[in-house]
Structures are given as C-alpha cells and as structure tokens.
C-alpha cells in the first residue's frame, strides 16, 4: 500500500492462495510505532493529518501535440503565484524538458525571479545531487523555487514545496509527491492547512504505467473535488484493492506464480513492473569541470580497459565518479547526435551534446520514446 506498509501479502493471499484454499500467512509487523498495536497504526496516525490535499483537475482537456501550451494556460498560469514554491512531476523526460522551457519563458516574460530547476534521468547523477542541494539552499533562504521533474524526485528526495502539480500516475505515486508539499510542517497542527497537489491528465500515464493503472487511477479520483491528507490511506487502500480485483491483473499474477512453482524461469523473467528500457544506450558525458573530474575518470576507464590500470585501483579511485557522469538515453537520440564509442558498451558525449539545465540534448526530430523515466 505504501513503501513502509506494503499490501503485497494481502493481495497475494486474495489472488493466489485463497482460491487454492490455502491459509492466510501469519504476517507480523516487526516495527509498529511505539504505543500502537499494528491494527491501530493506520487510523491513529493518519486521520489527523492536515498538511496537504489532492485536487483532481481531470475535467481539463489537453490537445494532442499542444499539451505544453494548454498546461501553461489552464494549469500553471491559473494555479501558481510568484509567492509559492512549486513542484511539477511529469511521466516523461521529453515532457519534463518541454514544460521546463515553457515555465522558464513564462517567468522571463513576466519578470519573475523565482529560481527554476529541471531534474530527470536525462541529467548526470553528479549534477542531480548538486541541483537538489541548490534547491534546498534556495528554500532555506526563503526563496520560492520551481522544480520540474520526472519520477526521479520521488525516490527519497527531501524537499518541501508550497504546492505541487502531478501528471496522472498510480495513486501511491501521487501520495509520494504530496509528501514533498508542506513536508516539514507539523502533520496535525500545520501553520498552513491542506496545501494543494493538483492532478491533471496529459495522456502520458498509459504508455508508462499501462492501461490498468490509468483506468483505476482515473476511477479513484473520479467525482472528487478534493481529497484531504487524512483520507490518503483509504484512497491508496481502495486503489490497490480495485487493481487486485481486475481479471487481467489476476490472470497475469496467477500465470507468474504457476511458472515459479513449476520452475519455468523463462516465463518468470518476462515479468516487468515497468517496461524495460531495452532500446537505451549508456553514454559517458565529458563535461567541462573546474577539476577536470570527467576527463580524469574517462582516461582512467580507458587505461583500465586496456590493462594499464588495475581493476582495484579503478574501482577505488574512479569508478564512482565515472558512473556519476554516465546516463542511459534512448538509442535513436544517441544515433542522431553522432556520438563516438568510448568502448564496445559506452558512447562518449561532449559539452556540445549536453545542456546545463536539461541534460543530454535530445534532437526534436528523433522519434519520442514512451519508456519509463523512474531512475
């Protein structure tokens, strides 16, 4: 149901074991909060929370091919003010880049001086860390930054915004983004009540998460004007219950479970939580840096591959930094950019291929990828 309180045992029993008349596994929560029994935890902890609310904007329509302009007009310009820090989370890297550019232009056109940042897997890991640090510094100084990001921001990033905007996604993902709004406030007695996370549907949910997720996410939000934080637990619970009851979900789960029992590992290996990024390539980006860190670790990598540098030395002194300058991008963007091979497995990109704000420069003439962008 959440990262810290998963529902997988309940779903596994309902879908796989109950129909075989097998007993419910005895599941013990090892670390319930002190003073609470496991069955008391959900109601006792969550029902008093008042920091945020989810506000569906599913009545809005976005013209295909004109989604960014429609977003700026219907959502951003109407919901955001210069006195608010804002987190915008999208499902695709390309969408993230397009909206970042549009928001940046909007700020310039209106003479707003809010700091603006982009964060996605298209940006080097080394630069992502620097960016998060810069955002934290801006927030601590009382500035009102805007962050446009993909789902990478959900993975343990400790930031606190005044409002959020989320493209349609699994309900638990929405709740994670809501956790970056009014984050540091007292959960029960916040100074500001129920700061909003607006949820829209740009059409990118289905290609990333699948038709079942899109269908159930829409059903979970349908007819609701707003959902207060106290109701999040029930919202997530009902969402996963409904997913578990879908026939196609059950059929796939049973098929995988049967394959595991029969040791048919080829079928098991076909299971994917998200579509694999099969058509991606690893790219080392040799960006100019004051200490020439990228150039040094590239040279060390080549010396290691040629046998001039011991593996132990490379792993100890260069490996981490090498990976901090490596990203995975769709193959056709790399081919379109004319990158040169660093070795048989990794391509080399230079400053000319990399934008300091949005990362690897994706030629707009290349075909857009409908691949996940979590990590």
Regions found by a protein language model. Name each.
Residues 156-158:
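Conserved P-loop NTPase nucleotide-binding/switch module
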Residues 163:
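Conserved phosphoryl-transfer motifs of two-component systems
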Residues 138-154, 166:
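Conserved two-lobed SF2 helicase motor
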Residues 4-79:
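Interdomain hinge/linker at the junction between the two RecA-like core domains of SF2 helicases
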Residues 49-52, 111-114, 143:
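A short helix-to-beta-strand connector/capping loop
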Residues 2-6, 90-93, 149-152:
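A short beta-strand-to-loop transition that corresponds to the Sensor-1 phosphate-sensing loop
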Residues 1, 85, 143-146:
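Loop/turn-to-beta-strand initiation segments
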Residues 10, 62-89, 94-137, 169-171, ...:
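C-terminal helicase lobe and adjacent C-terminal extensions/tails of nucleic-acid helicase motors
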């Amino acid at each position: 149901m959440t990262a810290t309180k998963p529902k997988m045992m309940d779903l596994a029993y309902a879908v796989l074991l109950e129909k075989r008349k097998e007993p419910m596994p005895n599941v013990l929560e090892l670390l319930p909060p002190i003073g609470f029994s496991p069955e008391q935890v959900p109601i006792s902890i969550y029902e008093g929370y008042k920091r945020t609310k989810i506000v569906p904007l599913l009545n809005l329509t976005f013209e295909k091919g004109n989604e960014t302009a429609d977003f700026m007009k219907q959502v951003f310009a109407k919901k955001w003010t210069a006195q608010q820090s804002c987190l915008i989370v999208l499902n695709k890297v390309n969408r993230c880049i397009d909206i970042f550019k549009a928001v940046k232009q909007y700020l310039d056109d209106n003479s707003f001086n809010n700091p603006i940042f982009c964060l996605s897997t298209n940006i080097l890991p080394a630069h992502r860390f620097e960016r998060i640090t810069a955002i934290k510094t801006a927030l601590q100084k009382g500035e009102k930054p805007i962050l446009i990001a993909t789902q990478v921001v959900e993975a343990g990033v400790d930031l606190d915004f005044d409002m959020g905007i989320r493209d349609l996604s699994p309900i638990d993902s929405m709740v994670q983004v809501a956790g970056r709004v009014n984050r540091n406030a007292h959960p029960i007695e916040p100074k500001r009540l129920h700061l909003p996370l607006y949820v829209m549907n740009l059409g990118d949910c289905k290609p990333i998460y699948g038709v079942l997720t899109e269908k159930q996410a829409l059903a979970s939000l349908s007819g609701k004007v707003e959902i207060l934080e106290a109701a999040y637990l029930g919202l997530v619970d009902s969402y996963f219950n409904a997913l578990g009851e879908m026939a196609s979900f059950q059929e796939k789960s049973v098929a995988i479970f049967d394959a595991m029992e029969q040791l048919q590992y080829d079928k098991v290996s076909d299971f994917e939580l998200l579509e694999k990024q099969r058509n991606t390539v690893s790219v080392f980006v040799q960006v100019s840096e004051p200490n020439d860190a990228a150039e040094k670790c590239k040279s060390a990598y080549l010396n290691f591959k040629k046998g001039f540098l011991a593996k132990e030395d490379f792993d100890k002194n260069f490996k981490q930094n090498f990976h901090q300058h490596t990203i995975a991008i769709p193959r056709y963007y790399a081919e379109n950019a004319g990158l040169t091979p660093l070795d048989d497995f990794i391509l080399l990109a230079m400053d000319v291929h990399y934008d300091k704000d949005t990362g690897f420069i994706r030629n707009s003439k290349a075909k857009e990828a409908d691949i996940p962008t979590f990590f």
